[in-house]
């Protein structure tokens, strides 16, 4: 992050602007909207600035710039076409630890002006850190179109009701949940439509409803890795959470989307490492919900596909805890799509089968004859440690040893790796593949070379290192 976004209160604070032309005019208009005490240093003023000076909306010094003018101001803006003067202003401000902006010269700026969407008191600021101003402007225009013009009334009303709410709703969590209901319900739609009286009545009705004592559990699929694959409903859920229990498969970019003051607790499991037993995870979820919290159980991929999500919701149901399920993009769909491997294709596969290689020792064995059929794609989760057995059994039950296979590691992530070969090479391919990894068996794998779009690839012949750098 090149710049820290800040909102500065400039009301009655002195701001020095060097320059009196059109460049300065644009900045001064924003400063006056923020009620700053604008001091202009320029030999002449544009007609618009001269009018503002005549109306005493700003003060004007028709003198040359001197370093001492920077001593008693809050911000400094150089808005001239004189490069030497701009350099002097920057040096003087920097030496006195004043924030300074030299218009259209990022190297001489300790702060930059963002593009602004003004729904006061609600403000949205967009910045490209000076890299792409046009992109910032385009984003601002899109956000302008999305946000209703009356949106600021919601914030004004919230400010009015805040102190009153503290006497009715005594905990921070209760107040937050109240505002989440209000801002997504009838009150918000009425206020945005301009019907303030009915909106206030709707808010009072919501306040008179009894606060629930029990929270809820929302089981959310985080997708296979790429934060862009998190569903909109999933994003809404993690933005509402009081506490998020997540596993190791949830990537950091997804976790960064969680509400900032939500508690994050890792309950993941990894082979060979200490992990939280499933029954303890179930208990943690139930206890948090019984405390009145909105609990999100965030799982990589889809929570109902080899994710043990159903077991956790069974515990919730037995405890009488309300719950929801937000599906996610499962690894077999996401990783193969990013690797350019379609799960089905009219010429190669009329079905796709998902199986797990991490099965319970006392469970019934696979129907290998069914799994070994041709004209189908086999996607195997958590199968790298059983790759030798999987390969041997499939070949023994009739699958051609030259059937194309792929091992997709860290699917949909920036460091995704796709290694291809044949079924008889599967053990070798999977041996040192980075985790998590998905095994894919089927003729559709041969389309990878033609359809791969996200990352480079490696073949069995070139795979002789513990980690293949495919970037």
From Swiss-Prot:
- Matches recorded under CDD domains: SUMT
Pathway note = Cofactor biosynthesis; adenosylcobalamin biosynthesis; precorrin-2 from uroporphyrinogen III: step 1/1; Cofactor biosynthesis; adenosylcobalamin biosynthesis; sirohydrochlorin from precorrin-2: step 1/1; Porphyrin-containing compound metabolism; siroheme biosynthesis; precorrin-2 from uroporphyrinogen III: step 1/1; Porphyrin-containing compound metabolism; siroheme biosynthesis; siroheme from sirohydrochlorin: step 1/1
Instruction: Specify where the region named Uroporphyrinogen-III C-methyltransferase lies, as residue ranges.
Output: 215-471
Q: Which GO terms describe its biological process?
A: cobalamin biosynthetic process; methylation; siroheme biosynthetic process
Disulphide bridges in this chain? none
Where do the record's region annotations for Precorrin-2 dehydrogenase /sirohydrochlorin ferrochelatase lie?
A: 1-203
> Which regions span the lipid bilayer?
none
Q: Which residues form the signal peptide?
A: none
- This entry's Enzyme Commission designation comes to 2.1.1.107, 1.3.1.76, 4.99.1.4
Residue numbers binding NAD(+): 22-23, 43-44
Q: Which NCBIfam families match?
A: cobA_cysG_Cterm, cysG_Nterm, PRK06136.1, PRK10637.1
> Which HAMAP family does the annotation name?
Siroheme_synth
- What protein does this entry describe? Siroheme synthase 1
- Source species of the chain: Klebsiella pneumoniae subsp. pneumoniae (strain ATCC 700721 / MGH 78578)
Taxonomy of the source species: Bacteria, Pseudomonadati, Pseudomonadota, Gammaproteobacteria, Enterobacterales
């Amino acid at each position: 992050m090149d710049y820290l976004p800040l909102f500065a209160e400039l009301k009655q604070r002195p701001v020095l602007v060097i320059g009196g032309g059109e460049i300065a005019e644009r900045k001064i208009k924003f400063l006056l909207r923020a009620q700053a005490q604008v001091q202009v240093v320029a030999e002449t003023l544009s007609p618009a600035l001269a009018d503002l000076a005549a109306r005493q909306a700003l003060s004007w010094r028709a003198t040359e710039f001197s370093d001492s003018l920077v001593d008693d101001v809050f911000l400094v803006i150089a808005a001239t076409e004189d490069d030497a003067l701009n350099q002097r202003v920057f040096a003087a401000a920097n030496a006195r630890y004043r924030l300074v902006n030299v218009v259209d010269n990022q190297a001489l700026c300790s702060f930059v002006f963002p593009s602004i969407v003004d729904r006061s008191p609600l403000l949205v600021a967009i910045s490209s850190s000076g890299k792409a101003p046009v992109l910032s402007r385009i984003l601002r225009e899109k956000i302008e179109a999305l946000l209703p013009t009356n949106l600021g009334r919601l914030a004004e009303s919230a400010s009015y009701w805040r102190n009153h709410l503290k006497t009715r709703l005594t905990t921070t969590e209760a107040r937050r949940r109240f505002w989440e209901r209000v801002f997504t319900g009838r009150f918000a739609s009425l206020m945005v439509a301009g019907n303030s009286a009915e909106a206030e009545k709707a808010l009072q009705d919501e306040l008179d409803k009894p606060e629930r004592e029990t929270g809820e559990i929302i089981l959310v699929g985080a997708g296979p890795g790429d934060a862009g694959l998190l569903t909109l409903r999933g994003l809404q859920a993690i933005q509402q959470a009081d506490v998020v229990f997540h596993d190791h498969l949830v990537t950091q970019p997804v976790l960064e989307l969680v509400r900032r003051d939500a508690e994050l607790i890792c309950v993941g499991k990894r082979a060979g490492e200490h992990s939280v037993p499933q029954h303890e995870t179930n208990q943690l979820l139930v206890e948090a919900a019984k405390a009145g919290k909105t609990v999100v159980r965030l799982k990589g991929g889809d929570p109902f596909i080899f994710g043990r999500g159903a077991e956790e919701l069974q515990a919730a149901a037995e405890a009488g805890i309300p719950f929801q399920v937000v599906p996610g993009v499962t690894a077999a769909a996401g990783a193969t799509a990013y690797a350019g491997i379609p799960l089905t294709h009219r010429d190669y596969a009329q079905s796709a089968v998902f199986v797990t290689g991490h099965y319970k020792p006392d469970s019934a064995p696979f129907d290998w004859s069914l799994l070994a059929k041709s004209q189908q794609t086999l996607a195997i989760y958590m199968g790298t440690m059983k790759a030798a057995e999987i390969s041997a059994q499939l070949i023994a039950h009739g699958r051609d040893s030259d059937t194309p296979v792929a091992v997709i590691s860290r699917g949909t992530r920036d460091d995704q790796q796709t290694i291809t070969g044949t079924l008889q090479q599967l053990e070798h391919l999977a041996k040192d593949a980075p985790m998590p990894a998905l095994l894919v068996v089927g003729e559709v794998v041969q389309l990878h070379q033609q359809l791969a779009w996200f990352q480079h690839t490696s073949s069995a012949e070139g795979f002789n290192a513990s980690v293949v750098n495919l970037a």
